[in-house]
């Protein structure tokens, strides 16, 4: 039996068996709760999307893990902009009203993020950088005025899989929730597709979410005692200030 291990994820350990099956194991109870949410969401969502998403062949509650067939593809770079936009349109149009999903008070949740970043990340910046960091944290108050929709919340290259030049699959739905659809545009508008024609206000909020991304990485590195996450997170944070 061939076995590959991916131990890089924050919430899950992933094993790939015989290049055919994915075994996904949560690292802690909050991650197990996210996995249960995925198990309730993905079967309802799959028919509404133009791409593959994981279809759990087996889901265990104790011990918690899931098994699904590997979705083949390479991380998205600059491929298939029309296909990516079609996926986003379908995702954000999906009616998730009957599904048990996190529905946070968005502004309050981001205020809590900002408070945590102010306590543990801001002090790591150089004195001359802190005023810009604080100004960014205060921008959290502007993350309002949108229609909440189902969001993936972690759309980066490694979760957007391409085959033959087309977006073929989207994985890792652990963060899915009802929230600001601009979050799903954060990396896409600021890396592969900056020339997309989108609403100015959506672009503004997407830029904020993109700039906040490395703050989460630094906080995670501090919380889990992983200095490399802190180092790389601070490097990316500084580049986005």
Region spans (language model):
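ATP/Mg2+ or Mg2+-diphosphate-binding catalytic cores
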Residues: 32, 119-124, 128, 200, ...
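An alpha-helical support segment within catalytic cores of ATP-dependent transferases
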Residues: 1, 72, 80, 93-153, ...
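Hydrophobic packing residues in well-ordered alpha-helices of helical domains and bundles
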Residues: 35, 81-84, 133, 211, ...
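ATP-binding pocket architecture of kinase catalytic cores
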Residues: 2-106, 122, 145
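Active-site Asp-x-Gly
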Residues: 30-32, 146-151, 156-208, 212
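A cross-family signal for key residues in well-ordered alpha-helices
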Residues: 43, 189, 219
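FAD-dependent flavoprotein oxygenase/oxidase catalytic domain
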Residues: 10, 48-53, 72, 95, ...
């Amino acid at each position: 039996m061939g076995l590959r291990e991916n131990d890089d994820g924050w919430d899950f350990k992933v094993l790939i068996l015989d290049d055919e099956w994915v075994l996904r194991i949560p690292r802690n109870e909050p991650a197990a709760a996210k996995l249960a949410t995925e198990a309730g969401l993905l079967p309802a969502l799959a028919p509404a999307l133009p791409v593959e998403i994981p279809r759990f062949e087996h889901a265990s509650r104790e011990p918690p893990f899931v098994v699904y067939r590997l979705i083949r593809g390479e991380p998205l770079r600059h491929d298939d902009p029309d296909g990516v936009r079609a996926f986003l349109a379908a995702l954000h149009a999906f009616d998730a009203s009957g599904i048990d999903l996190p529905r946070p008070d968005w502004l309050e949740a981001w205020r809590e993020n900002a408070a945590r970043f102010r306590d543990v990340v801001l002090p790591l910046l150089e004195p001359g950088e802190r005023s810009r960091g604080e100004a960014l944290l205060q921008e959290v108050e502007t993350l309002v005025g949108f229609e909440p929709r189902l969001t993936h919340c972690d759309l980066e290259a490694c979760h957007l899989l391409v085959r033959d030049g087309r977006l073929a699959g989207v994985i890792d739905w652990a963060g899915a929730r009802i929230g600001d659809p601009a979050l799903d545009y954060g990396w896409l508008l600021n890396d592969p597709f900056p020339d997309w024609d989108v609403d100015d206000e959506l672009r503004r909020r997407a830029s904020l979410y993109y700039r906040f991304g490395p703050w989460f990485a630094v906080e995670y590195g501090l919380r889990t005692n992983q200095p490399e996450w802190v180092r790389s997170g601070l490097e990316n944070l500084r580049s986005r200030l």
